[in-house]
Amino acid sequence: MTDLGQAGESLVAAWLEQQGGKILQQRWRSPWGEIDLITHFPDTKIIAFVEVKTRSGGNWDQGGLLAVNARKQEKIWQTANHFLASQPQWSDWNCRFDVMIVFSQGSVPTGENAEGKFANLPTNFQMGQTIVWQGYRLRLEQYLTDAFGG
């Protein structure tokens, strides 16, 4: 995974926590693939398996949406089943499959921001707001709840 992809995932993890989610796993692997984020929402008894797509301008796949095709969905679904089989304490929770699109406006030039790569997140950041995070300018573009079925 690229540094940009990791920055996008960690930004989404922070945003999910601000929304009341608790991150169970990040980059959880199984023989079928990897799930970027596994989050639970205690107030609703929901576990979200979140696929994060971080893209810059001029990409071929509509900001990452086309990359979550039927084959990718099947891999995520199989990996989620493997996770649930290995973690029986979550077996009675409802599950959903979400997708977050993160747009990168490029890296922050050295010296532009004294904190640059290590800038702290605002206490409450919103969708559409550009954030300097881990050396990149990132914007949470779109969060698709229950984007595909299992």
Swiss-Prot record:
Record Gene3D superfamilies: 3.40.1350.10
Example GO molecular function: nucleic acid binding
CDD domains documented for this protein: PoNe_Nuclease
The protein's name: UPF0102 protein sll0189
Family to which the UniProt record says this protein belongs: Belongs to the UPF0102 family.
TM stretches of this protein: none
Domain of life: Bacteria
Matching InterPro entries: Restrct_endonuc-II-like, tRNA_endonuc-like_dom_sf, UPF0102_YraN-like
